[in-house]
């Protein structure tokens, strides 16, 4: 299943796409977060070009599992995004992903 990954930022969104098997992700580009309609237009174009079947958004939870200020922003973004696209949107817990990537 082809997936699109979004790394949410206040000013820019990092976009990555999976390979055809949905196993490896490759960075694509950054899209300005505002205005939202321009972001959404570019996102939909990428989705159509790459035949994306799902979106995964990184969720920056605290180490204790709680939601900090940035995670609350991501949660709100995901809720809006789910109403803006026709594919499933899910979150991925980002705790320790930077540590794992360094190894």
Give the ranges of each region predicted by the language model.
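Phosphate- and other anionic-substrate recognition elements at nucleic-acid/protein interfaces
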Residues: 2-3, 11-103
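Conserved catalytic-loop position in the HRD/HxD motif
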Residues: 7
């Amino acid at each position: 299943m082809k997936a699109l990954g979004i790394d949410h930022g206040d000013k820019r969104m990092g976009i990555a796409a999976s390979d055809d098997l949905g196993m490896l992700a490759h960075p694509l580009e950054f899209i300005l977060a505002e205005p939202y309609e321009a972001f959404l237009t570019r996102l939909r174009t990428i989705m159509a070009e790459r035949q994306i079947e799902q979106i995964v958004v990184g969720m920056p939870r605290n180490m204790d599992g709680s939601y900090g200020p940035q995670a609350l922003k991501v949660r709100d973004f995901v809720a809006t995004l789910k109403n803006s696209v026709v594919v499933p949107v899910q979150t991925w817990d980002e705790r320790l992903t930077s540590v794992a990537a360094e190894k």
